[in-house]
Regions:
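N-terminal amphipathic alpha-helix/helix-capping segment at the start of soluble metabolic enzymes
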Residues: 1-4, 48
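Histidine-acidic metal/acid-base catalytic patches
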Residues: 2, 9-20, 80, 85-88, ...
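Short, flexible loop segments at the rims of nucleotide/cofactor-binding pockets, characterized by
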Residues: 2-3, 76, 149, 176-178
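Hydrophobic faces of well-ordered beta-strands that scaffold small-molecule active sites
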Residues: 3-7, 24-26, 55-60, 98-100, ...
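Active-site-proximal loop/turn and secondary-structure-junction residues that shape catalytic pockets
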Residues: 9-11, 28-30, 61-64, 104-106, ...
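Structural motif corresponding to the early beta-alpha repeats
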Residues: 22, 26-119, 235, 239-240
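Catalytic-core regions built around general acid/base machinery
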Residues: 40-51, 121-134, 188-191, 219-224
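Active-site acidic/histidine proton-transfer and metal-coordination neighborhood
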Residues: 69-171, 264-266
Length: 266
């Protein structure tokens, strides 16, 4: 597996490289800046140019103002234009994965039927999937904890929507924190194995990097292994403080590797 931290700080990215991580995951608003001119994006790239660690994923695909479900969903052409900018810039930076969590943009208003939301969401994925494919980018739909978002909560649910898009560029992400908050089983990950393209994790209950509080990641890694997943895993949680960050990140990485080895041993 390849391990990363989520960060928008080049200094923290440099610490991750020193600690032995394989890549970093940034956010679309901070790094790609799709609502800003090209010069803003180039400045983002320049900020990371001297940090010797690749950027291989970007999260927070849609800002909350670009609603994609409900009666106030923005026009499809506007969403597609935004997505095209994101994919084009990610491709220019060599970033192959964009994470479609964006709970604020997809949360359903009271009374809006899930069936209508499914139709809206699949229509969007079907429209933007080919755009992503053309740029060599994959879209990872991220199921979120029910306490954070009321739409797309389980890994198998996300996979079903990805399949319905008809696009090979659309897959699903398994996030250990959300998966555990929702009390999912390994079965939801196994049911998504044909569309599983990315993973996140953090501790429960405090949503921290591994090693900061006790948490057993082995069940999550066993579920990933059962699904045949051996790809990228990004830590999306609170990181160690700056005083001993490199040591803390090394501990996080060691914790993950040990949990993975434990899972593989059964």
């Amino acid at each position: 597996m390849r391990y990363a931290i989520c960060t928008n700080d080049p200094a923290v990215a440099a610490d991750a490289r020193e600690a032995g991580f394989d890549y970093i995951e940034v956010s679309v608003p901070s790094f790609v800046k799709p609502l800003e001119p090209e010069e803003a994006f180039e400045a983002s790239r320049e900020a990371y140019r001297d940090v010797d660690i690749p950027i291989e994923a970007a999260n927070l695909f849609l800002p909350r103002e670009l609603r994609c479900t409900g009666p106030d969903a923005v026009p499809m052409d506007r969403l597609a234009d935004y997505a095209e900018t994101v994919f084009r810039r990610l491709a220019a930076a060599g970033v192959p994965i964009v994470v479609f969590g964006s709970g604020g943009a997809r949360k359903l208003p009271d009374g809006w039927p899930k069936e209508k939301a499914d139709g809206q969401f699949v229509a969007l994925l079907s429209r933007i999937g080919p755009l992503a494919e053309r740029h060599g980018v994959q879209i990872a739909v991220e199921p979120l904890a029910r306490v954070e978002c009321n739409y797309i909560n389980t890994v198998d649910e996300g996979a079903a929507l990805a399949r319905a898009s008809g696009s090979p560029a659309v897959g699903v992400l398994a996030d250990c924190y959300h998966w555990a908050r929702n009390e999912e089983t390994a079965g939801t990950i196994l049911a998504a194995k044909d569309r599983l393209i990315h993973a996140h994790l953090a501790t429960m209950p405090s949503r921290k990097a591994p090693g900061i509080e006790p948490y057993d990641f082995a069940p999550f890694f066993r579920a990933l292994a059962a699904a045949g997943y051996d790809g990228r895993v990004s830590i999306e949680g609170g990181l160690p403080g700056p005083e001993r960050r490199v040591d803390g990140l090394r501990k996080a990485l060691d914790t993950l590797r040990a949990a993975h080895e434990t899972a593989l041993r059964g």
